[in-house]
Amino acid sequence: GCHCESGMPIHKTTKLETNNAEIAALAAPRPLKLISVGGDWTKNTPKVEYPYAQSIYKYFNALDKVENSHFPKEKHGYEYIKRQAMYPFMAKHLKLDTTGVLDKRSGDYDETGNTIETTQIMRNFHSATEMPVHALKPGSIVQFR
């Protein structure tokens, strides 16, 4: 998997164990879009994680707020086809005006006005030594009081 979102240190510690389905379902009843592909660990999302998320959303009477778009022939990444699946979901739930970005004939959203930032620009901290002294260290247990 990719360290960008599989986050194994948060899945299993000496004191707790969870999985992506449980973490995703924490969003309930807020809108949740699961985008999955056949070429990585999300390949089972339509049969495992998505039905689990639906079962949690059902408790909140919010089945209309959870969706899955699955691309069985795609590999890991967030390419154009996957972003195109996300845009209508976001437009619906954020009540966005799609005028000027949605091509009503093709159904595609125009991305030409988007700026792709470099990794360096997007980072809050450029190294572990720049993190605040009070920041949680990897593997820390969060305690609620």
Where are the model-predicted features located?
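Active-site-proximal cofactor/substrate-binding loop regions of enzyme domains
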Residues: 22
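Alpha/beta-hydrolase-fold serine-hydrolase catalytic core, especially in secreted/extracellular enzymes
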Residues: 28, 35-145
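Primarily recognizes the serine-hydrolase "nucleophile elbow" in alpha/beta-hydrolase
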Residues: 1-16
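General secondary-structure edge motif
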Residues: 3-7, 33, 69-70
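Beta-rich catalytic cores
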Residues: 19
